[in-house]
């Protein structure tokens, strides 16, 4: 009986291969993987390297790639729209961090039944006055997170920081009382003395840390259990820090030329080089 059992085990492993319980079949799968998957791995690596090469499409992207725009403040000064997330990667660099705040399933009722997708909330920031929020819905979790990160980079805004009392050291808190709202959620921020820390719930605290604010008092009301509205209200609050002018900004404004006007020759030459030349027609006379 023992011999029969051994023979059956060998037969199962040899005949069924991948689906058998015998170890012989699994070993065969390993050999096959060594043959086929090794080549695939090389190809995948090549594709990734190709994707890393950024070819700018917009005028702003071409100026950033060429090094004519070196600071993100130049973009904010002229209110230029950012359409490529690689611009943020080049200007802010490795200091930009991201965190997934929440992934929630959402459903839509169709004739065939309920269609389930996943919604991701992602916050990005460098901890030095720049923060962004991205929301993306997709069939797969990984795709939703990847899309939310890209949207968060495209929505990066400057955050104005100030002092609670005397202007000693670096700015550490919000410049004044500011309120943000989304849905039923209202978030209010009040300047705090140095050393107070961020007095806030878990959700707005993470956003404020990414924005580079060290001390602030916060109060919130409404349905703060709805994390999406809570994050959006906090982000709206930080956006409004540059929404008005305080006395130190009442000085006469010095107008400067837009980067598009300064580097007109570069953009024109770039456009001419990318365009195809007209074919030369020879005379048959």
UniProtKB/Swiss-Prot annotation:
GO CC terms of this entry: cytosol; cytosolic ribosome; cytosolic small ribosomal subunit; nucleolus; plasmodesma
GO BP: regulatory ncRNA-mediated gene silencing; translation
Biased composition (Basic residues): 35-46
Domain S5 DRBM: 96-159
GO MF, one annotated term: mRNA binding
Phenotype caused by lack of the gene: Reduced DNA methylation in some of the targets of RNA-directed DNA methylation (RdDM).
Basic and acidic residues composition bias: residue spans: 1-19
Domain of life: Eukaryota
Residue span of region Disordered: 1-51
UniProt KW keywords: Ribonucleoprotein, Ribosomal protein, RNA-mediated gene silencing
SUPFAM superfamilies, A to Z: dsRNA-binding domain-like, Ribosomal protein S5 domain 2-like
PROSITE patterns tied to this protein: RIBOSOMAL_S5, S5_DSRBD
Function recorded in the entry: Component of the ribosome, a large ribonucleoprotein complex responsible for the synthesis of proteins in the cell. The small ribosomal subunit (SSU) binds messenger RNAs (mRNAs) and translates the encoded message by selecting cognate aminoacyl-transfer RNA (tRNA) molecules. The large subunit (LSU) contains the ribosomal catalytic site termed the peptidyl transferase center (PTC), which catalyzes the formation of peptide bonds, thereby polymerizing the amino acids delivered by tRNAs into a polypeptide chain.
Subunit architecture: Interacts with MBD6.
Protein family according to the UniProt entry: Belongs to the universal ribosomal protein uS5 family.
Protein name: Small ribosomal subunit protein uS5x
Naturally occurring in which organism (per UniProt): Arabidopsis thaliana (Mouse-ear cress)
Gene label: RPS2C
């Amino acid at each position: 009986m023992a011999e029969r059992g051994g023979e059956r085990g060998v037969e199962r492993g040899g005949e069924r291969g991948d689906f058998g319980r015998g170890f012989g079949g699994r070993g065969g799968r390993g050999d096959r993987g060594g043959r086929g998957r090794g080549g695939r791995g090389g190809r995948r690596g090549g594709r990734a390297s190709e994707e890393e090469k950024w070819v700018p499409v917009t005028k702003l992207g071409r100026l950033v790639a060429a090094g004519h725009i070196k600071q993100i403040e130049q973009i904010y000064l002229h209110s230029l729209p950012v359409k490529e997330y690689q611009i943020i990667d080049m200007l802010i660099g490795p200091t930009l961090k991201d965190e997934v705040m929440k992934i929630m399933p959402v459903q839509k009722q169709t004739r065939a039944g309920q269609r389930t997708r996943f919604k991701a909330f992602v916050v990005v920031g460098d901890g030095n006055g720049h923060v962004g929020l991205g929301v993306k819905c997709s069939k797969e979790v990984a795709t939703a997170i990847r899309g939310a990160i890209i949207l968060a980079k495209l929505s990066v805004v400057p955050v104005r920081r100030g002092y609670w009392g005397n202007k000693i050291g670096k700015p550490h808190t919000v410049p004044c009382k500011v309120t943000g709202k989304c849905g039923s959620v209202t978030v209010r921020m009040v300047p705090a003395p140095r050393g107070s820390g961020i007095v806030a719930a878990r959700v707005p605290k993470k956003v404020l840390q990414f924005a580079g604010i060290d001390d602030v008092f916060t109060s919130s009301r409404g349905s703060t259990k709805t994390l999406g509205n809570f994050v959006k209200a906090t982000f709206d609050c930080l956006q409004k820090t540059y929404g008005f002018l305080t006395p130190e900004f009442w000085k006469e404004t010095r107008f400067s030329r837009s980067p598009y006007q300064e580097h007109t020759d570069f953009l024109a030459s770039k456009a001419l080089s990318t365009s195809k030349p007209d074919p030369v027609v020879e005379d048959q006379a």
